[in-house]
């Protein structure tokens, strides 16, 4: 009897509290109604009025509300602001209540954006709070504009920071200065433990103060935090100083900027122990060689440069203080100051402000980790102090008043702050000279021969495991820096380089990957490489990568246009270095997934077969736009797959003309090891469809291991669809459970007949059926009836596509 009594007591308490505030709330509701010319509005329901009163006094009533019975609490949840709604989550779950629908409605009403159809949202609370954090940080949302977002007892940034798993920094590094400000220390501490992915999009030129803030932010989030992935997107003209800063910090190197505050966490970690003479070398690995004269010279140059920058920073300090003060004032005005949040009741699991223990510097590096950045030219003293980043490194020769530094006596450049001179020379000639100077730098010679400052003076901490560069053109000095960092980046597990304009720098990349693969503890297992052009044909490049990284598990490579070596008639066509291309056999590797996107032109089948023969563990192969000289060459590839790749489960062909390879297609469909085959836009039924379709169906009926067949874009038509229905007949041993027939000129009457045949054979549910971009809008009633019947047999995925867009395709099939 105790439980019902407690329930009634809580209900009475709720009614008493609500009644005490009802008159005040009613007067506020009625006042505007009397003055309205349109007449009085309908009063809110009594329970809703009571709920509003309780939600407005949650600061006093929170513990009592948490103890309310489930039915009453369920009605109050939609009336709470986002802060109390987030805090009550655990209690609601214990009472069998879900807040997901409330968070979804908040997303629709406040964020006003629709998630991507490809995105599967598992937790709307986390998604909303993460987006809310980003909007508040950038100042793109006014928390005072909606009562559900505004509460003086909470800091929007601090309260939502624990849900942030992915943070995006855009344009002029907005948000970096705010996050490292002293009032937001607890916000940054929370981010250090919750944030996993850091993204940079559409970066623009930034000043020294913004870069200093970013340096502190990256140090806290990567070196002392949990960030494991850094991605850069769409940076058409990268600022070299900023790009190299992001790279070196991601690789685990840390050098406090000139005039910057010391790291509190580093001080706590080193407090209580005497500094070691060889501390720098220990941080870089026990097997690091001793510093030679050139490296000592480079370190001295860096120290000189930092002193000069410290003077500039001191002169710019007043302006910086004004900027930071105005930034903090704007944050305070927006309600984003880090006040101390009210502690939840004793039943809450929340413990805001819990300090993360500082991470100790990593000491597992087993080889030299010096960064390599090319030496830059100092601008004249009368030039503007702002850096002028360029797409390519320019020499200062011929520029009046410019000074060329040579040797150690000249003034140095810091690793993170380059000033470039625009010279009147041709870019190609300058790149060639830089390449001549840089030759051999990645083959074991001293990086100081490039004039690159050594990083031995830097401490090395925790580094990220995933690096992604999308549409970020790499200049020569940026590519050299990346390659030199990669050669000892043993913690890196996944590397993506997409449309970076590597050009001849691909050879330096191969050298660095080869050096990385021999390092003890190398973890690189996934490489994604795509570009417009490549100095190597794609198959030779694939062979070189597989030889350089024999432990690689996933390789995705795409080249959009053929290289010069694909056209021997091009004059001055020089071959690659001898250590990159060789005729020797490829050693056995660990590849499990290989994806290749080919440029136009016939590909040599023997080269592809050599890669497949060495990849005995291959489980997934995807060929995009591959062209072979003859069907026999394609058959040679398929025969190699059957003999050497016995573990292959998934095979995909996209945008390939297989109209003349019907016997090879039948050979694939009879393979009893494959579980999934994709023929996407392969023109399968362009020739002899009446003879080929029955042969194809017969091969599939006898294959009991094939689970998925994808045939989008092959002009199957109604006749082909009805022929495929025979795969599910009673005399078939097929176990097909996924079928994709998108973009196949299928009409509603054909789809309806297909559904009736499946019903007649009674095979039961066979899985998923995809029907995107077919001509189902020509008879909407028949299409709806067909889909209704199909849904009793399988899970149907379709869309409302306008078939008039496919007029040309329709004419071609008349």
UniProtKB/Swiss-Prot annotation:
Record field: compositional bias (Basic residues): 389-403
Compositional bias per record (Low complexity), positions renumbered to this chain: 354-385
LRR repeats: 489-509, 520-532, 533-557, 615-637, 638-661, 703-730, 733-754
Keywords attached to this entry: Leucine-rich repeat, Phosphoprotein, Repeat, Ubl conjugation pathway
GO cellular component, one term: nucleus
InterPro entries with a match to the protein in the record: Leu_rpt_41, LRR_dom_sf
Region spans: Interaction with Elongin BC complex: 45-54
Residues modified as Phosphothreonine: 327
Region (Disordered): 265-408
Phosphoserine, modified sites: 155, 276, 326, 375
Domain notes: The elongin BC complex binding domain is also known as BC-box with the consensus [APST]-L-x(3)-C-x(3)-[AILV].
Assembly and oligomerization: Part of a E3 ubiquitin ligase complex with elongin BC complex (ELOB and ELOC), RBX1 and CUL5.
Name used for this protein in its record: Leucine-rich repeat-containing protein 41
Organism: Bos taurus
Gene responsible for this protein: LRRC41
């Amino acid at each position: 009897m105790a439980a019902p009594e407690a329930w009634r007591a809580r209900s009475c308490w709720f009614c008493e509290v609500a009644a005490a505030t009802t008159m005040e709330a009613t007067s506020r509701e009625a006042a505007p109604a009397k003055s309205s010319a349109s007449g009085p509005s309908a009063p809110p329901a009594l329970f809703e009025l009571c709920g509003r009163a309780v939600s407005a006094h949650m600061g006093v009533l929170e513990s009592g509300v948490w103890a309310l019975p489930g039915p009453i609490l369920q009605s109050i949840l939609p009336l709470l602001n986002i802060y109390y709604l987030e805090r009550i989550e655990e209690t609601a779950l214990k009472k069998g209540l879900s807040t997901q629908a409330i968070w979804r409605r908040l997303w629709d009403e406040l964020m006003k954006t629709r998630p991507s159809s490809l995105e599967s949202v598992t937790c709307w609370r986390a998604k909303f709070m993460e987006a809310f954090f980003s909007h508040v940080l950038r100042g793109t949302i006014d928390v005072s504009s909606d009562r559900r977002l505004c509460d003086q007892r909470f800091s929007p940034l601090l309260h939502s920071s624990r849900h942030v798993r992915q943070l995006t920094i855009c344009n002029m590094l907005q948000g970096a200065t705010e996050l490292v400000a002293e009032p937001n220390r607890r916000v940054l501490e929370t981010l250090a433990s919750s944030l996993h992915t850091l993204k940079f999009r559409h970066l623009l030129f930034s000043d020294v103060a913004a870069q200093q803030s970013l340096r502190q932010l990256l140090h806290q989030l990567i070196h002392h935090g949990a960030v494991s992935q850094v991605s850069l997107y769409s940076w058409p003209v990268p600022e070299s100083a900023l790009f190299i800063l992001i790279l070196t910090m991601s690789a685990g190197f840390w050098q406090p900027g000139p005039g910057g505050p010391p790291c509190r966490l580093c001080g706590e970690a080193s407090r209580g122990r005497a500094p070691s003479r060889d501390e720098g070398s220990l941080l870089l690995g026990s097997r690091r060689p001793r510093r030679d004269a050139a490296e000592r010279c480079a370190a001295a140059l860096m120290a000189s440069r930092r002193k000069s920058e410290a003077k500039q920073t001191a002169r710019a300090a007043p302006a910086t203080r004004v900027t930071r003060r105005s930034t903090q004032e704007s944050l305070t005005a927006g309600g984003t100051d880090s006040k101390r949040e009210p502690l939840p009741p004793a039943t809450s699991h929340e413990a805001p402000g819990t300090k993360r223990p500082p991470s100790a510097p990593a000491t597992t590096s087993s080889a030299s980790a010096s960064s390599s950045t090319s030496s830059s030219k100092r601008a004249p003293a009368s030039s503007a102090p702002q850096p002028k980043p360029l797409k390519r490194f320019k020499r200062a020769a011929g520029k009046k008043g410019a000074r060329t530094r040579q040797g150690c006596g000249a003034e140095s450049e810091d690793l993170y702050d380059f000033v470039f001179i625009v010279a009147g020379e041709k870019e190609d000639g300058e790149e060639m000279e830089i390449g001549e100077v840089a030759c051999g730098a990645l083959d074991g010679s001293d990086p100081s021969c490039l004039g690159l400052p050594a990083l031995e003076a830097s401490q090395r901490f925790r580094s990220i495991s995933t690096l992604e560069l999308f549409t970020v053109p790499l200049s020569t000095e940026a590519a050299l820096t990346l390659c030199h960092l990669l050669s000892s980046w043993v913690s890196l597990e996944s590397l993506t380089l997409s449309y970076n304009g590597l050009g001849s720098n691909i050879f330096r990349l191969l050298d660095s990957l080869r050096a990385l693969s021999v390092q003890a503890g190398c973890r690189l297992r996934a490489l994604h490489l795509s570009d417009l052009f490549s100095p190597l044909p794609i198959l030779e490049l694939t062979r070189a990568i597989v030889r350089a990284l024999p432990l690689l598990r996933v390789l995705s490579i795409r080249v959009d246009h053929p290289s010069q070596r694909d056209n021997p008639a091009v004059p001055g066509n020089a071959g690659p270095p001898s250590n990159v291309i060789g005729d020797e056999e490829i050693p056995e590797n660990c590849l499990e997934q290989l994806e290749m996107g080919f440029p136009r032109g016939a590909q040599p089948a023997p080269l592809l077969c050599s890669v497949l023969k060495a990849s005995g563990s291959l489980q997934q192969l995807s060929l995009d736009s591959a062209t072979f000289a003859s069907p026999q060459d394609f058959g040679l590839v398929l025969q190699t797959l059957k003999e050497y790749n016995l573990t292959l489960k998934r095979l995909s062909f996209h945008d390939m003309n297989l109209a003349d390879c019907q016997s090879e297609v039948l050979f694939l469909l009879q393979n009893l090891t494959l579980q999934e085959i994709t023929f996407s836009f392969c023109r399968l039924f362009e020739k002899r469809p009446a003879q080929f379709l029955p042969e194809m169906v017969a091969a599939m009926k006898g294959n009991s291991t094939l689970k998925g067949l994808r045939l989008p874009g092959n002009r199957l038509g109604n006749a082909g669809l009805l022929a495929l229905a025979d795969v599910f007949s009673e005399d078939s041993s097929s176990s097909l459970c996924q079928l994709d027939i998108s973009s196949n000129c299928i009409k509603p009457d054909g789809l309806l007949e297909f559904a009736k045949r499946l019903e007649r054979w009674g095979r039961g549910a066979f899985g998923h059926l995809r029907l995107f971009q077919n001509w189902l809008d020509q008879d909407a009633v028949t299409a709806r009836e067909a889909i209704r019947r199909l849904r009793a047999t399988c899970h149907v995925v379709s869309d409302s596509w306008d078939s008039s867009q496919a007029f040309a395709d329709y004419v071609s099939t008349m």
